[in-house]
Amino acid sequence: MVMKKKRIIAMILAGGQGTRLKELTEDLAKPAVAFGGKYRIIDFTLTNCSNSGIDTVGVLTQYEPRILNNHIGRGSPWDLDRMDGGVTVLQPHTRKNDEKGWYKGTANAIYQNIKFIEEYDPEYVLILSGDHIYKMNYDKMLQFHIQKDADATIGVFKVPLVDAPSFGIMNTKDDMSIYEFEEKPKEPKSDLASMGIYIFNWKLLKKYLDEDEKDPNSSNDFGKNIIPNMLNDGKKMFAYPFKGYWRDVGTIQSFWDAHMDLLSEDNELDLFDKSWRVNTRQGIYTPSYFTKESKIKNTLIDKGCIVEGEIEHSVIFSGVKIGKNSKIIDSIIMADTEIGDNVTIQKAIIANDVKIVDNIVIGDGKKIAVVGEKKIIDSQSLVK
């Protein structure tokens, strides 16, 4: 059955485990990790879709999907609770006489959901990652794709050449047509890194997905298989240069850095930008309360907090309690964490629902200390 035909639909790859985030992803998928005081990482991609006029979105989940599924719900925070389209959570599944099961790679994840895509008979399919922090108008990228008469367009972001070996790199001609793709090259020729954002002409992509699935030697991956195969076949592929804030927060260091970016005077992300409001699903909290003794400097604080101590250059999520004479410096304190009196926390990431008793020191200001959610930190605990 074909529902109302869509010009373009988006498919968000959101099943990643995020092992490099360690304690932060023990019980939830990377796109569900909290960010920026009240958001989750996937909020940025969902908001981009909504603000770009894309009203049909499939979210492909796999690892620890419960919290992510509950957060997305019917999609109302992003105006994606629609009868014809909207947001649909797509989990790996098996069918009768079918042993597909878990997604084997990014391309296989899309392949397993071809029927969902075909319901809307789109001209174009936008493939996205659900675990990056950025604000982007995908419609501008689509117009670029159409103007270039491209078969595929890949979003790229300029990185320092010294960092290029950590990314998939696009080598392009002057007109931004791609002539070579190198996955994490030791000696990069270009500084244009793939953002993991692709626009494909759907009928052509479906053909390549079908062929890739039949190849027993394939990794079933866009970067390793689909993109190189299309290039080898001479398809018209272009790089779309994105200018703005974009961060892969896949490591503890990059996650902490992205939060510290929010506190800089020249913050490019700007969560207070009314023209591109980032939407989320959030609980109901009272306004935050600050005692006479509290001291706050260059800090982002959400609702529902009670602060009796000092906070400097930190991001404090909703519902956090900070006791008397406690000092929080260069840190990220996630929702509903309770910090006792005379506690010092420096350059640390404290996850949700942590209880820290009085007179505890966490972090030395050099290495980033991390405390997983729902932990109790007492005098017997050791946090580095």
Swiss-Prot record:
Physiological role: Involved in the biosynthesis of ADP-glucose, a building block required for the elongation reactions to produce glycogen. Catalyzes the reaction between ATP and alpha-D-glucose 1-phosphate (G1P) to produce pyrophosphate and ADP-Glc.
Enzyme class: transferase
Signal peptide start and end residues: none
Organism of derivation: Fusobacterium nucleatum subsp. nucleatum (strain ATCC 25586 / DSM 15643 / BCRC 10681 / CIP 101130 / JCM 8532 / KCTC 2640 / LMG 13131 / VPI 4355)
Name recorded for this polypeptide: Glucose-1-phosphate adenylyltransferase
Reaction(s) catalysed by this chain's protein: alpha-D-glucose 1-phosphate + ATP + H(+) = ADP-alpha-D-glucose + diphosphate
Keyword Transferase: yes
GO biological process terms on file: glycogen biosynthetic process
